[in-house]
């Protein structure tokens, strides 16, 4: 005598089938971007050159995705973005840039007390092709930063503590 599947098993099978159908439909959606570039812009409140626990993320900072042809250096694509309340920007891109070098670059800070561009933190490279072994469309970019005009009072003690922690590791 054949056994009747338990209701939980049947429900799980139906849910699994629906998930597969919906994911296939979403994968074929021509309106979805090929790539989603995401990163953050911060204010280096200690002028340390890196993110600390007193770093502030900047809402309303302007960034630009620039893709330049590898051989000629000609600008092939530029897309502007703006950070949200958490200092996070999201830029959607519809096509691949296999022959390009793409970087997100700082454009402007809305904070007058934190608008000095940090060398080496003013741009972040992103790979925008599928031919590099990355199948996910989300492409995270390294954080971009500006220096605060005057370090916060807590910074001297914080940087001393960080230096002391480094000495303990040796």
UniProtKB/Swiss-Prot annotation:
Key words, A-Z: Disulfide bond, Glycoprotein, Signal
SS bond partners: 43-114, 46-155, 67-102
Cited Pfam families: Pollen_Ole_e_1
Tissue: Pollen.
Glycan-bearing residues: 53
Keyword Disulfide bond: yes
One cellular component (GO) term of this entry: extracellular space
Protein family (similarity comment): Belongs to the Ole e I family.
Record protein name field: Pollen-specific protein C13
UniProt source species: Zea mays (Maize)
The organism's taxonomic lineage, starting at the top: Eukaryota, Viridiplantae, Streptophyta, Embryophyta, Tracheophyta
């Amino acid at each position: 005598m054949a056994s009747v599947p338990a209701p939980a098993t049947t429900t799980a099978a139906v849910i699994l089938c629906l998930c597969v159908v919906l994911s296939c439909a979403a994968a074929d959606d021509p309106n979805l971007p090929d790539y989603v570039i995401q990163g953050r812009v911060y204010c280096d409140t200690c002028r340390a050159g890196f993110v600390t626990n007193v770093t502030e993320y900047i809402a309303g900072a302007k960034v630009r995705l620039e893709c330049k042809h590898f051989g000629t250096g000609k600008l092939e694509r530029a897309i502007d973005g703006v950070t949200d309340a958490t200092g996070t920007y999201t830029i959607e891109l519809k096509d691949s840039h296999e022959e390009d070098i793409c970087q997100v670059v700082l454009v402007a800070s809305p904070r007058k007390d934190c608008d000095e561009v940090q060398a080496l933190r003013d741009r972040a490279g992103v790979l925008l092709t599928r031919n590099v072994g990355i199948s996910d469309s989300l492409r995270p970019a390294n954080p971009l930063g500006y220096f605060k005009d005057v370090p916060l009072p807590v910074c001297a003690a914080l940087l001393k503590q960080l230096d002391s922690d480094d000495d303990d590791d040796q």
